[in-house]
């Protein structure tokens, strides 16, 4: 577990950010989505991102509960985060806690409730345009270039010799796979006969 001193000394970067307990839940979805779409990261809730003043989270239970629901209610699909509480002394000298939200890098593309896609770049959550979002889908394997329509293509663009070669490779591979299954069945039958002797 990190200490409060380590949190305060750490600069905001691609994998770390501080947020006030007063942050709007919809606004908190943005860095969660952005980190999940990038390398993952951690959010420290209860530390002002502008002044780095320790506000803490105690005494703000209603807002805290709203923020804890953000990964489920405002992220699509939901982001599976891990939360921990770090004891601290707030700026008024009272015992308090901050909330650390650990966000794993995801193999899926995540958006906020407005279907906007963000990615963490440096210490900012960058909103992706359509092309950047499509590229992220390809990078995460949720979309394949083979599925992309090529609107101006005609049958003349297809190299039938390559198609024929491909079909031969596929049919040979399928034949070999069927042959292996037949051989395995024969071996299993021989083994069963031998074990019954």
Tell me what each language-model feature is.
Residues 1-197:
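Conserved N-terminal catalytic/coupling substructures associated with nucleotide/phosphate chemistry
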